[in-house]
Amino acid sequence: MRPLEGVRVLDLSRVVAGPVAGRILSDLGADVIKVEPPEGDITRIWGEERNGVAGFFLQQNAGKRNISIDLRKPAGVQLVTDLAAKADMVIENFRGGVMDRMGIGWSVLSAVNPKLVMCSISGFGQTGPEAHRQAYASVIQAESGLVHRHATLDGRRPTDPVTSFADYNAGLHGTIALLAALHAARATNVGTHIDLAMLDSMMFTDDYLHHAIDDSEIVRLGGEYWQTADGNWFEIAGQFQFVWAKLKLAFDLVDPTPKDAELEIKIASRRNIVREFIANHPNADAAIAMANKAGLPWGRYNSPEQAIATPTAVHRGIVTQIDDRAGGQRGIVQSPYRFNNYESGVIGRSPHRGEDNAEILADWLNTTPASITQLLTDEVLLTQSQ
């Protein structure tokens, strides 16, 4: 049994932020229906394509069922409205106001389903001076101050991180809000509309933003990277004063600077001593043994390929295998939830566009085969071949 078995989710979102929320809910047992436009989700062409499924689309949409609907047609709008009437949750990530203009906004959907909970994920919110703006993760990472901080601290030109932090933050917070709203709706029989901005989510999860609020100087609290004799790097966590004290105690390191020297001079001297001490270790394994002896927390400087192959990653099943659509298996990152008495995790395959049209309409709406055929003929419903 899975925690969310019996929960129905209509996922109108695309790209990453909304689909992440849908993927999590699916892994937890919900029946998640991805509604895809005729042109397909843009992530269908991002990443390596195997058997008609690209890597980005696979990661965010595996386990969902798929229906392709043309929302430019009145019959398509009606179909989504009918599906929402049977759903517990709706996820969408259009710009503010777009759902209303399409005729499937909150006022319409809540009228046909008063217990519905709907999460609208946008860059800058459903209302406000910039609600109309388009947003991707890179836009929010620039606007939130994240890129500026890293560029300033590292003394380099601004570059976007090679990870969609803003998308995943929004997806995770959207999932939390949806589950809270579902709990309330089941207790009160009253649904709710969640206005979740990627900017809000990004800034809430920024543990350094208090420096800007307090107008105080940023002090980096993370660890430092050190190099061993063979040129490999590894990380020791904690502020340098903590690292120095541990190494000094464990290995009798000596700082030759006078006791009355300026603090900056002492720190520079001790940093050089630690750098030379670690550089005398032949490789990362030797340095890790040293860190363990000193009682210091450490981390390997892994490539992504190394990270997914570590003993812990393998033991935890961080990468699992699903149907590759050609009789084989394909790797995918597993969701991180491990319950002691429930099942969880991705199951099934990543769907082709419109692959489950007939099955979904029969399951949710009891639509007849003849009606489904007519919807296909009228190109209200579409398939990947169209």
Please state what every model-predicted region is:
Residues 1-187, 285, 352, 358-386:
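N-terminal helix-loop segment corresponding to the beta1-alpha1 unit
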Residues 32, 292-306, 367-373:
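Short, well-structured beta-strand/strand-turn elements
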Residues 294-346:
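A glycine-rich dinucleotide-binding beta-alpha-beta segment and adjacent secondary-structure elements
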Residues 159-169, 221-223, 234-235, 260-261, ...:
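A short glycine-threonine-serine/GTX helix/turn-capping micro-motif
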